[in-house]
Each structure stands twice: as C-alpha cells, then as structure tokens.
Amino acid sequence: MHIRQSLAEIKNSFHPAFWVANGMELFERLAYYGQQIVFMVYLRNRLGFTETEAGTLSGIFGGLIYLLPILGGTLADKWGFRRAFNIAFSILGLGYFLIGSLGMSAFAGIYGGLSLYWLLMAFLVFTAFGGSFIKPSVLGTVAVASTEKNKSFGFAIYYWLVNAGAMIGPTIAYFVRDSFGNEFVYLVSSVSCFAMLAVNLVLYKEVKSEKTGATESLGKKIANLFVVLGNFKFMIFLLIYSLYWIIFWQEFIIVPYYITDYIGKEAPYEIVQSWAGAGAIILFQIPINRLTKNIPTRTAILIGFAVSSFIWIIIGIHPSIPTIAAGIVAFAIGEMIQAPRYYEYISEIAPPGQQGLFQGYAFLPIAIARFVGDPIGGWLYHSAKLAGDPSRVWWSLIGIGVFGTLCMATYNKYVAIFEAKQAIRGA
C-alpha cells in the first residue's frame, strides 16, 4: 500500500504531458537504437555496401541526428511541442520505412536502376530531419511540465527511459533480425514511430510555460553558434570530449561486424551491446553517482574517460562474447562516472548568464564524433579485415582512448594553472 501511494504521489507531482512525452521518448529511442544496432550489418550484408561506405553513411545520419536539434529546437519552440511531435513522428515513421524498403524484395522493382547509395543518403537525411525535433520537444516538455522541486527527478526519469529504450530496442531487433531479416527491423521502428504519432494526437496536451519571453529566431540561433565557437576553452574541451564518443559509437560500428564475422553469424550482438551497455546504466547509475558525487568535476570526467578508454584492452587480449560484454559494461561504468558531471562542467565553464546557451550545445561532441568517428570505424574495420588482422581494430581504439585521456589530462592541468593565476590576480 505504501509503495502504491508513493508511486501515485510521483505520478501526480508531474503534469500529464510529462508522462506522455517521456513515454513517446521511450518508444522513439527504442526505434532509433533498434535500427542503429543493425545498421552497419544491414548496409553491408543486405544492401551490398563496403564497411567504409557504410561507415560514411552512418556518420552522416548520426551526425545530423545530433547536430540538427540545435536548430530544430527553435522551430519546436515556435510551432509548439505538439505540432513538432506530429511532424517528427510522421517523418521518422516514413523515413525508417523507406530505409528498410531498400532491402525488401517487394520493392526491388521500384528502386531498380537507381543509385542505391544516393537514394539511401536522401532517406537518411530526410529521417534525420524528423529526428531533430524529438529531443528539444521532450526536454522542453520535461522542463515546463515539472516544478523547481521535482525538475531534477524529472530529468532523471527521462534519462532512465532513454536507456530503457536503448536496451529494449536492440533486444527486439535481434528477434526480428533472426526471424525475418535486418530490413524488417526498420519496419518495427517505423510502426513504433507511427504509433507514437497516434499517441501524440490523442493524449499530448500543450503545456504553457510560466516563463514569458520571445522565442529565439533561427538567425539568433545561428548567431549564438558563433558565440559558442568563439569560446576557445569551451571548444577545446568539446573537441577532446568528442574523442570519447568516437570510441563509444564503435559499439554500433565495429562490434556488430566483428561478432558477425569472427564469432558467429547468428550471434546475438544486439543483446550483447544493449544489455551490457544500457542495462548496466539502468542498474548502476544511481549507486555510482552516489559513490563519485564528491569527486571534483574535471577529475570525474578524466576518470570516466580513462576507464572507458582502457577497457578495450579486455577485448583486445581475447575477443569473445564474454570479453566484449565485460568491456561494454566497463565502458558503461566510465560513462556513468563522467556523463552527469559533463553537464555540470558545462554550467561551470559557461560565462555568467550564458549557461542555457552553452548547455544547448552539449550534444555537439556526439555530432562531431558521429561525423568523424563512424567513417573512421568503418575504414578501420575494412582495412583490418583486408589485412587479415581483425584484432588491430581493438588496439586502434585503445590508441584513440589513450590519446583522448592524455589530452583531457593536459586540458585539466592547464585549466587548473589558468584558474590559479586568475585567483591570484583577483586576490
């Protein structure tokens, strides 16, 4: 009875739109991570692209997914979140279907004679445009549908549901891929998004913000981009931090290829990645946060960076399902140590009065990592496979991780020196 009462209190403490938006986010992430985990294998084994070509296409798609929300948020604010959700889920539902249709025999006659590469490129860019409205609309709803008292808890619920989707989506993808084929994973993602379109139309009600003020124009957003780019210390930090995400996304680039080619074609790489990664975060995020909360922000980021970088040694020594799973769990521990502190550090580094502006570019390192890292991952694997030495990919990732860790340590050292000098001058 006490548990039921507590759950009811939590439910009633938020506006109904909060739960609708987060429920839609769960299914959107389910759709995204479900298709992302099979993306590289689908492009190579079904559509006939090389690993290098697949990496390039993945980089464009993933890069746009994380870059466009910077501008998509402006349109979402202007249109209202309900309308933005309608547009987003309509485009995502159609986009995922089109991507999957390229591998379906039923559509072979329609696409015959067309350049598969450029056709897929068009479908990916179209789908990424739809995805650009999701995060701003969900995070915007969380912000306006919660109070100052429960807002922190509201974002914790959002983060937990994102990881739940990241675990459930690839799990479903495995069973669909095993029974029907990779192309039908995109059909599941499409159905999931169209279902959320229906949910949005029926259940989502716009929440009016208590804060009043003019919505930033698209021109103002672009001008703000140059303000952020002009902050040298912030940009150096973001560029170094992007090295972390380059390594992370190899779980979706290199790991599926390696398991498929060298461990077993039917091996459940989807479950290995999702349960070891997102599953670990769901279970251990809160206790790890409590254990590391007193570590200085930059130190916590460095520790998380180092842990996530060096774990590839576990895989490199003896690549197998158990060691890959163990490596991904260890990587997730590193992520849990540093990820929450990353946003905290952005608030610290931002000039007074510009914290919100700088937080708006928090996803920029992921966009950089996808644009750069996905093609690198595809090329690395392709080259190692041709050379008959697939294990070199793990040592290459270790090299990137060590380099990134050293860069972050150097950054921390010089920032500490700079801050000490500033303190002396101000004394």
For each feature predicted by the language model, list its residue ranges.
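C-terminal ends and interior cores of transmembrane alpha-helices
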Residues: 90-115, 306-319
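Juxtamembrane intracellular "pre-TM" segments in multi-pass secondary transporters
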Residues: 2-15, 210-239
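Glycine-rich segments within core transmembrane alpha-helices of 12-TM secondary carriers
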Residues: 65, 152-177, 192-193, 362-374
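Intracellular juxtamembrane helix-capping segments at the cytosolic ends
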Residues: 133-147, 336-351
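A membrane-interface helix-boundary motif in multi-pass transporters
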Residues: 114-117, 175-192, 379-402
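Short amphipathic helix-loop junctions that connect adjacent transmembrane helices
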Residues: 37-53, 253-271
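Helix-to-loop junctions at the C-terminal end of transmembrane segments
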Residues: 68-81, 177, 283-297, 381
